[in-house]
């Protein structure tokens, strides 16, 4: 697990390297799902409509055929502005089958956010719901001058009649998904793909630390990470297991796990466009869901919400948490609540890594760890001050090298060179360490560390402390400038419903548990909700206005 190269320390996977198939991802998907043509592959969590593997495979090819009729060319971009719907699967893979590029964004984005993300990659086509179209139609030509066709996808609560009326009154720019797929699925060419050089998708970096950047991922990036993760993650699944697709498909974490890995493996995926606690728990009960990929806010629900006790969740065996670190306190609360029968696993990565690099292995689960290195990867941990490689147990910035590292940022060579070093290692910007068993632990983002009196204070550590208070529902910690001290921690807390708590009570409880330099000298503010991204990452930058308050 430790390799010394030219006197420098590197970390290798405990797993042997695997062979990465040299085929585009849609070819592999079609091959695998046609093995079990009659098996239910997708379920619409709103309508309960079921889709067989055979139907999904046929629809992928019908999307390819429909796009061919629209004269799609290799490298053309189809912007996907959709929630989690069954149609996401054929739209995604059908576009890639034609050599097109899918660019994925949050359907809740405003026009301004769309202009800073999707519009920058000049999409030729858009796939949207009626609600999204209503939001963008008046600004379509201004924000998306490159768009030639908008494909409307039906969602529960909208009628096909409404969509058909729009297609007739939109100067020919709008067509329905049904119109796109109204063909035999056979009339499309075989497009030659350069696996390592051709971009397959352009998701956008989270924007939690700055402006959005388009991340160019190749077919080989996607295939590599699907097979790397499969090596560890699917070995305990059973033949007819169901998973619930609540993680946003527009995010690389939800996309790879559901649209690629779970589809390829043939597990039944119940799609849910938006996380609603009651519906989410009802679907777990109804479809006997065995596995759920979640983010920390959902984990907090499993740990603390009384609503969980109202549902039969006996089918649930595993929770896999990613997108942001999950503190050991919340993990332990879930285990205690479910009397140890639930396996809590974590994964770690970044959009730039397609996205996974660590996954909790089967067997020994270490509370608070993000897991061990996936196959075919090399890691190093570097000092944020000297840039030198560090050893086991030493804390520094985690850097990853392997076949899942992105091609680069879209039209941004400068930003690419800032995060990928001369040896091909991606600098994650996250601070962590590796223990003697090869388990990695994430402490915090290097840019978010609070530097107080010469000490580095990880906000995540203080957030975990606040979350362990029985009356606290959610929490976020940021750094606040204060003269000679540098920065001091300031806390933001959401109190549990029907509970009361004062700042003094919370400070008196917290301060004896932490070193003096970690004390909340910036105070604690009680707010209605903690700002988070769609994938559950804390948006500390959104609390900037509070930081402008004078101490």
From Swiss-Prot:
Gene Ontology biological process terms, A to Z: phenylpropanoid metabolic process
Residues bound to CoA: 274, 453-454
Region of interest: SBD2: 347-409
Residues given in the record as ATP binding sites: 205-209, 213, 346-347, 351, 430, 445, 537
Organism: Dictyostelium discoideum
Task of the protein: Carboxylate--CoA ligase that may use 4-coumarate as substrate. Follows a two-step reaction mechanism, wherein the carboxylate substrate first undergoes adenylation by ATP, followed by a thioesterification in the presence of CoA to yield the final CoA thioester.
Gene name per UniProt: 4cl3
Pathway involvement of the protein, from the record: Phytoalexin biosynthesis; 3,4',5-trihydroxystilbene biosynthesis; 3,4',5-trihydroxystilbene from trans-4-coumarate: step 1/2
EC number of this enzyme: 6.2.1.12
Binding site for (E)-4-coumaroyl-AMP: 253, 323, 346-347, 351, 447, 451
UniProt-listed InterPro entries: AMP-bd_C, AMP-bd_C_sf, AMP-dep_synth/lig_dom
Known cofactor(s): Mg(2+)
Protein's name according to its UniProt entry: Probable 4-coumarate--CoA ligase 3
Gene3D superfamilies: 3.30.300.30, 3.40.50.980, Luciferase, Domain 3
Region (SBD1): 276-346
